[in-house]
Structure formats: C-alpha cells, structure tokens
Regions:
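Short catalytic/ligand-gating loop segments at beta-alpha or beta-beta junctions
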Residues: 110-128, 147
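Acidic/histidine-rich catalytic neighborhood of metal-dependent amide-processing enzymes
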Residues: 1-100, 107, 122, 126, ...
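Glycine-rich beta-alpha junction loops
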Residues: 75-78, 146-150
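His/Asp/Glu-rich mid-to-C-terminal helical/loop segments that flank catalytic regions of hydrolases
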Residues: 150-218
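Structured lumen-facing ectodomains of secretory-pathway proteins
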Residues: 105-109, 197
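Short hydrophobic alpha-helical runs that function as membrane-insertion/retention elements
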Residues: 141-144
C-alpha cells in the first residue's frame, strides 16, 4: 500500500477510540457496539476459507441473525469540515431491505441536522465498508467527511448529470475525473498527516456524541 493511510483510515480509528473512552466514562447507558476491522484489500482468504475485513463481519452478522442493528461505517474522517452521509445502498435490494435502509438513512439525516447544522450533505460515496453489509442484505450507512469546496463542486456535478449517481456507485471510468480530491488521495502518498484538517475532529465528535445519545432501538 502506498502512503501511510492518515485519512484512510487512521483518523477515523483514532476518533472512534476517543469516542469509546468517552462512552465508557461519561454515559450511564448507551447501546453502541464498536467493531474495528482490517484487511479488506485482501478479499477472500482462500487458505482459511473466509472473508477479510467488513465482508467477513457482515457474513457473521447475517449468520447470527444480527440484521436489525443501525450499522455505520466510519471511514476517512480526517479531512474536511462537512459531514457526508452516503446515499449509496438505496434501492439495492428487496422491498423489506429498502424500507429498513430508508428508515436508517432518514434517521441518520436527522442526526446530521442536529449535530452538524448547515455543515452536512448526502451524496453517493463509491467506497467504504457499508457496501459489504449491503451486499449481505443488511442496511448500513457510510459516514465520511469532505472539505466544503470539494463537497460543493461534487454536488454541482451530480446536479448537472443525473446519470452520474449510478456511474459513481458503479465506479465507472467516466466518474473518476469529477470525484473529490480527498477521495483521489486514497492509496497514494498524498494520504498523509499534512493533508488532514484540524476542524474534522470537532465535526466527528459532534456527530458521534449525537449518535450515542440517540439510543434508537434496533
């Protein structure tokens, strides 16, 4: 792998660890389960006959019947001041799946409005571990960050070209040029500490705190 992965995904790991410490010391009750995963680039481990990364966890969740939790993939959250709620996954399955996904999606939008007023967007995100859960028929939402200028430019392109949404989700070659710079930095030597932004930490702290206080029942 090229680069140190400062944004993808060291920043989010650090943010979630700090959040876990707060959950443990400052809240009398919460219904949060935190799972860290790695090795998604490996894919299927043919020697041990199992999936790596989030796909392995998603397959276990499905086998155990854990399909009603609100699942979030916290991914690449160290650069930017705008919270991004991924719309990727909508209309990806049966009517039952779509209903559950839309309920989770709308609840996430409400959390974004409360925690990051006027500093959030919802757009298609062509990466993140929520895709593994969606592939297993389990609704999951990706949460990430972008600088305001990049988020605004990307949204304008989506508004100009209504086919672009599908191109992004399917990772079409035609969509690569319009993707935000932050995403283009992933897996390159530009994914470094120097390209992280200090304001990202407060944005994520606000969202994660709102998520902990939500206490929605699965």
């Amino acid at each position: 792998r090229i680069g140190i992965g400062a944004n993808d995904n060291s920043a989010a790991v650090y943010q979630v660890i700090k959040w876990a410490q707060k959950l443990n010391t400052q809240l009398d009750f919460h219904n949060i389960r935190i799972i860290f995963t790695d090795g998604e680039e490996i894919g299927f481990d043919s020697e041990n006959k199992n999936f790596q990364g989030a796909l392995g966890i998603a397959s276990i969740f499905k086998r155990l019947g854990l399909t009603n939790d609100d699942i979030y993939a916290i991914d690449s959250c160290g650069r930017g001041d705008v919270l991004v709620v991924s719309s990727t996954g909508k209309n990806s399955g049966s009517k039952d799946f779509t209903k559950k996904f839309n309920n989770l999606y709308e609840n996430t939008i409400e959390l974004a409005k409360k925690s990051c007023p006027e500093k959030w967007v919802t757009i298609p995100v062509p990466y993140s571990d929520n895709a593994s859960f969606v592939a297993m028929g389990i609704p999951a939402i990706a949460i990430t960050l972008l600088p305001k200028t990049e988020a605004t430019s990307y949204m304008r392109e989506l508004q100009k070209n209504h086919n672009l949404n599908n191109d992004v989700v399917n990772r079409s070659e035609t969509s690569k040029d319009i993707l935000p710079l932050t995403w283009k930095m992933m897996h390159t030597d530009q994914d470094c500490i120097e390209n992280l932004t200090i304001e990202s930490w407060s944005v994520m702290e606000n969202f994660l705190d709102a998520l902990a206080k939500d206490k929605s029942l699965a």
